[in-house]
């Protein structure tokens, strides 16, 4: 109930970007930083990645705030949130987009299997993911990266294993977002939470981190955690065009 009654946090996000800028931080998209980790190395850096897990309309609101601040970021959409109108609008503003893939956990759940069967499913899931990435690029244009999504119903199963140690180019990618980060030193990996859950993981305060000149900071931001709780009830309402599907499109 606490989450349902929570207020929107858009002013908090505006303040975060404003304070980062006033403190001399370079605010970069994840892809821009991966493309050149030494970029703006003379400045402290705030790297922004968005995982659009729910409520795709909230992504448009957050992107509008970034446009006002002159910020570009990287956005990962699940199939259930990849509404054409939303993805195309965000991409047209200059942001990078990619698939927030959940292929392995989805296949296990659809087959009624559990964590014990995950390893044996990996080769098949990799082939499915290859097709999903091609389908995403066909619908929304070329992409350079993808990022795994998790599923708490299958503890210990990580979708990221599908691209770990793989030739990403064979999947039409330059990077897997999580795997690529392993090659770089991040000072703070910051992930947001809903208001009811404390706003930020481990009760970290991004403003304090900025004042302390911590860098680089990777901020993993979920737009649905910033919308009003009542707004989440509209998560499945049509927006900007027909939904691409609750899971994955037909491929083949």
Regions inferred by a protein language model and the residue ranges of each:
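Extracellular glycan-modifying ectodomains
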Residues: 54
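Terminal accessory/targeting
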Residues: 1-48, 57-74, 80-94, 104-252
């Amino acid at each position: 109930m606490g989450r349902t009654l929570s207020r929107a946090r858009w002013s908090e996000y505006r303040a975060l970007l404003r304070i980062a800028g006033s403190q001399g931080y370079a605010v970069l998209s994840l892809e821009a930083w991966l493309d050149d980790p030494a970029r703006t190395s003379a400045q402290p850096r705030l790297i922004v990645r968005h995982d659009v897990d729910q409520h795709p309309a909230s992504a448009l609101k957050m992107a509008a705030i970034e446009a006002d601040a002159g910020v570009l970021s990287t956005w990962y959409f699940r199939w259930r949130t990849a509404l054409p109108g939303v993805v195309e609008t965000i991409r047209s503003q200059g942001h990078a987009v990619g698939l927030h893939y959940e292929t392995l956990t989805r296949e296990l759940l659809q087959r009624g299997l559990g964590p014990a069967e995950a390893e044996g499913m990996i080769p098949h899931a990799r082939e499915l993911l290859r097709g999903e990435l091609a389908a995403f690029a066909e619908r929304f244009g070329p992409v350079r990266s993808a990022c795994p999504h998790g599923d708490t119903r299958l503890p210990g199963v990580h979708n990221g294993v599908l691209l770990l140690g793989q030739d990403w180019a064979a999947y039409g990618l330059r990077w897997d977002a999580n795997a690529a980060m392993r090659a770089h030193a991040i000072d703070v990996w910051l992930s947001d939470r809903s208001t009811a859950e404390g706003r930020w993981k481990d009760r970290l305060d991004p403003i304090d981190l900025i004042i302390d000149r911590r860098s680089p900071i990777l901020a993993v931001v979920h737009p649905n955690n910033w919308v009003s709780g009542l707004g989440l009830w509209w998560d499945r309402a049509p927006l900007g065009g027909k939904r691409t599907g609750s899971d994955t499109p037909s491929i083949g």
